Structures are given as C-alpha cells and as structure tokens.
Design a protein with these regions (language model features):
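Alpha-helical interaction segments
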Residues: 13-15, 27, 43-44, 84, ...
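Short, low-complexity N-terminal intrinsically disordered segments enriched in polar/charged residues
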Residues: 1-30
Length: 133
C-alpha cells in the first residue's frame, strides 16, 4: 500500500513540476522574460542578476529561433541530488524543434521551495546547428 501511495505523490510532483517547467519554457520562447525570471529559484537569482539573466536568455532565444515543437522525453523525481540539500527535485528532458537547431534537447531541474512551489533550479540544452548540415 505504501509504494502505491508514494508513487501517486511522486506522479503528482512530477506533473505539477512539468506544468511549471512548460510554463517557464513558454515564457522564454515568447519573450516573457520577466515572468520567467520570477520562476527561478533564489539560488539562481543570486548567481544571475536580473538584467544580466534577461540579456543572456534573450540572446539564447535569438540563437535558437522560433520554437516549432516540444515533447517530454523523460521525467524523474528525486529527493536527493548529489551536492545539493535534500528536498523535492524533478528532472525533465524535452526533445525540442527550433527554427535554427536540430537534435535539440532541453533539460530542466525544478526544485520545490519552502512554500511548496516549484521553481527552475537549472536549465541546460544541447543541439546541432542547422547551418552545419
């Protein structure tokens, strides 16, 4: 019984985190950088001042071009992540199609804050440039 209940909560955490992740990605894809910045974890905000982060993410989105599609390829809940405090973490991997890239994969790490809200803790990606064909 415990494992069924635990799995149910894990699924809820993953689904809730994925909604926040997709909303955040939608914000950065549609120049809603202020909204996106507000969803960053405090640790990220401490590393990247507001204006610097907005400049960086804007340049990145210009490089990628317009989003054509995005599909979740992996989702994983963990309560422990090496080098980080214990908590609730969700890793999500997306296969994305952008105008200027190919074989584009986006990775999000979300962390639940002390108010039980999911926040973006890390964003990473890999791709090949379409011009390299």
């Amino acid at each position: 019984m415990y494992s069924v209940s635990a799995q149910k909560y894990t699924d809820i955490y993953i689904n809730d985190a994925n909604k926040v992740g997709l909303s955040w990605l939608n914000d950065i894809n549609h120049n809603q950088y202020e909204n996106a910045y507000n969803l960053l974890a405090k640790e990220v905000k401490e590393k990247y001042p507001h204006e610097a982060w907005i400049t960086l993410i804007n340049e990145l989105m210009l490089e990628f071009g317009n989003l054509e599609s995005r599909t979740v390829t992996q989702r994983n809940f963990q309560s422990q992540v090496e080098g980080m405090e214990d908590g609730f973490y969700v890793f999500i991997e997306y296969s994305s199609q952008y105008e200027n890239t190919k074989e584009h994969i986006e990775y999000l790490l979300l962390k639940q804050n002390d108010k039980a809200k999911w926040e973006i803790f890390d964003y990473n990606y890999e791709f090949k440039n379409k011009k390299e064909e």
